Amino acid sequence: MSQSEKNFSQEHERLSQRRGGESESRNAGTPVQVARAQRQGNGAMLGQLSINPTVMMIIQVLLGAAVVGLLAQVSVPLWPVPVTGQTLGVLLVGAALGPRRGAAAMVAYMLLGIVGVPWFADFTGGIAAVLKPSFGFIIGFIPSAYVSGKALEGKGPHSLLKLFGWFTLATVLPFVFGLPYMWAVLYSLGKTLSFGGIMSAGLVPFIPGGIIKAALATIILRVFIIARRG
């Protein structure tokens, strides 16, 4: 091979290598394109790691039950009986989670308490709670939370009066279930009370506290609505 042929061969090889490098550079993309592709890949990975909606619902329900269990241990001295935060927790959890999830949270609160989680009032729990005259009120928490969840439904203005009306109704519902249950348990124990006696024992002393808790829930929710708009 002559010297000129060797020079031509070497020049051709250099041109081929240069073209190959340019092709690889185009395939790899610019640094900006590479960074964008990496971000898209990371976003797709985060999307795959997002929490399943069913799992999220279960977490919300259990957290709602835990909030009520925690507030059930809070007691404020008030005449004629102390006021606990239990019903207030029911109202707020129902409003926060909505009708169905709020009611589901109260079902979880009741069932887990029955199987032994000590989050009923005074850190009590267990199957024996079913035999207590006050257990009917816990049953009533289920429809109470459902009604509370209705407070924020609809597109109309959520005025203080409207919210207070919903929460007052939700406060009444535990008594609708609790008073007959109380009468039935006491009757099974041989302690028969008249209608007036049941009202005096299970309703009248709790009216002031019920009004206060409905008002507190109304104020808290109204502040939340205003803050969310702002």
List where the protein language model places each region.
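Membrane-interface elements of multi-pass transporters and channels
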Residues: 74-81, 100, 115-119, 123, ...
